[in-house]
Amino acid sequence: DSDSYSKQQLDDLFMDMIAYYDGDPKRIQHFTKVHSYARLIGIGEELDDASLFILEAAAYTHDIGIRVAEEKYGRCDGKLQEQEGPIIAQKMLSQLGFENYIVERICFLIGHHHTYDNIDGLDYQILVEADFLVNLYEDDAGNRAIDKAYKRIFKTETGKKIFRLMFGYEED
């Protein structure tokens, strides 16, 4: 039922993530943008309510492992984010009353969002596309990286459309 997928829980999670990244506006801006694109693509691809809810929560929390990775290892590459993130997210999501099966899927997505060769669902595909849309811009990617990302990563019609418009990209 749609009560399980409450807007209030997502808003509470948004505030908790802002607090989690206290003093780090760049990371707050990043997950906010990833969430916006993830939601837009999810709606465009007609995700069911449960999948959209999971996607939105995963978009807010996808990089939650960064801080711990930096503290423990002095760096925060994708693999370390995937390794450290789920534990922190599991605690935060459970405290906010997210149901177990939802927490499990979100933690799976956090633990795999830099792994592109075994995408097992539309929620996962869209999270990766949204993260790429934001990262390509934030990292000031060149034309080769943009071309490669489009061909290798983007599968949804909505994600491809946003990509083409954002980067003025024309398919071969």
Predicted regions and their residues:
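Short amphipathic alpha-helical interaction patches enriched in hydrophobic/aromatic residues
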Residues: 21, 42, 68-72, 93, ...
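An active-site-proximal "capping" alpha-helix that borders the catalytic cofactor pocket
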Residues: 34, 79-95
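Active-site flanking loop/helix segments enriched in acidic
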Residues: 9-33, 65-75
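Mid-chain, well-packed structural core segment of small domains
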Residues: 92, 96, 104-109
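A general alpha-helix detector
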Residues: 16, 37, 88-92, 129
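His-Asp-centered metal-binding catalytic motifs of divalent-metal-dependent phosphohydrolases/nucleases
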Residues: 52-74, 85, 107-114, 131
